[in-house]
Amino acid sequence: MRHFARINGADADLWGAVGLLHDLDFERYPDMPTADPDVAALSHMLVTEGPISAQLPGHPFYGVAHLREHGWSAEVRRAILAHADYSGVHPESPMEKTLIAVDELSSFVIAVALVRASKSIFDVDVAAVKKKLKDKAFARAVNREDIVRGAAGLDISLDDMIQHVVTALRGDAERLGLQGVSPGA
């Protein structure tokens, strides 16, 4: 997210926070409701400052409610809701569209790096990622259609999107533990 914020001339800290926080409730509240008018109305309540008068149905609603309670902006809350296609919040801003685009792809690229003998993001390129995308057994929980739609939502090619994510992860390789291991380690 920070990489794409810099490309867009946006606040890298804000975009980075959205990237870190968007799934903060997923382990505890993994349920994802069906899209319907009630869910959309709840999303609207969570973005605005009005009272929340409905039961929270699961991810990402609990996380967004928590962020609202702790003073996070409507911009952040809306971006997090927009990444859930069932929330009724359609992505509009570059930050919202980018979160959707990198959500599945960044995890997928990390998985590609970690199955390499070197465990290094520096040994991952676009061709390696695309080859693994074709292997439906690899990282089977990752929704490939979401990856393709994410790139399209940013109006960039899938190859360019993958390259951006690889580049971003390389820039943070040490912190993410993706700099690799020594042979025989």
Report each predicted region and the residues it spans:
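Active-site hotspot residues in diverse enzymes, especially metal/ion-binding acidic/histidine motifs
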Residues: 2-6, 12, 156-172, 181
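Residues at alpha-helix termini
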Residues: 3-7, 69, 135, 153, ...
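Divalent metal-dependent catalytic cores for phosphoryl transfer on phosphate-bearing substrates
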Residues: 8-136, 148
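N-terminal cap/leader regions of alpha/beta-hydrolase-fold enzymes
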Residues: 53-56, 69, 156, 160, ...
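Metal-centered catalytic cores of metalloenzymes
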Residues: 74, 89-90, 163, 171-179
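C-terminal binding/interaction regions
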Residues: 128, 134-161, 176
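Feature captures the catalytic cores and cofactor-binding loops of soluble hydro-lyases/lyases
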Residues: 184
